[in-house]
Amino acid sequence: FMYIFIDAENSQWMMKFSMFILTVYLFFSVSRIVTYLFWLPTRKKKWMSSGIAAGSLLFIFFLYSALVTRTDYKVNELDMTFSNVPTGFDGYKIAFISDIHIGSMWNAENELKELSEIISDINPDLLVFGGDLVNIHHSELTPETLTLLSRIKGKDGSYAILGNHDTGAYINGSTPELRVKNIEMVRSKLENAGWLLLQDSTVYLKRGNDSIALTGMDYSDELLEYKHSLSSIRGYDVSKVYKTVPDNIFNITVSHLPQLWYSLCDGGYSDLTLSGHIHSMQFKLFSYSPAMLMYDEWSGLYEREKGKLYINDGIGSVGFFARVGANPEITVITLKRE
């Protein structure tokens, strides 16, 4: 509903206002419900006091998730072993981030500055971004934020794909022409920041005589139909994206939608798929999340015979200004040869 009144001119402040109102409403409503759940069974005063205490503690926890957890970056490091990783890429380090949602960051410059410093310390060979850089409109990419994005990089470059929010699909009155313009502006601004946008295209990374392929799935109008799909997308034709990619080369595919993994695996195209999109619904406690009830794959590492999938929990937030246990994530993957 919050997108109804959002257009190109008011996208940032209107989204932040809507998210703030929704966040306050959720915090107070849930805390109040907990208070009454304690009191209703017996309707005794002592249980009302216990309910007030429980509701207050819950409210404090929610407040912590908005003020602290939301920007408390977590670095997840993992080794991934493959039999077909070339010798030259044994030990190759990839920093993977996703879903920045710049337009709904409370203080984008401070948050991006901290992110750039963490990734600079990691000093990865490659920087990969999994889509949803902006929230509504390309105007969220200001000269200041682009300068900070230019500092987020890998030694072999920085590569990005589009997410559903980057397409302009959420602007009130969005048209195909408006979406094309928004995508072109996002691409142009990314290039100015030193990031290369992959749109159904592949680049080849080299180490001596060895090479691997990095493929980026574009977020086409056809995929927009699946932007809120809960089930895995099977039978989607991805073959055109890999027409010029050699069959025997180790391939990393970046797809904003993790639901595409089955189509990628069934075709034998991707050895490692990197995705975002779900954010663990910004609620994850002790590895449990509402997302696990809705999606086949929702966070972390998944494996099938034909490939692996890693879903990053994202950096920014959308809908409400909080990350309840679901810290913003920087994934550091080190490739290992079996």
Which stretches of residues belong to each language-model region?
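Non-catalytic terminal accessory segments
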Residues: 1-71
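Short, well-ordered helical secondary-structure segments
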Residues: 8, 51, 55, 60-67, ...
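Generic structural motif
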Residues: 33, 43, 83-85, 165, ...
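N-terminal signal-anchor transmembrane helix
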Residues: 40-54, 59, 64-98, 103-122
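Soluble catalytic domains of enzymes that build or remodel membrane lipids, polysaccharides, and related
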Residues: 88-338
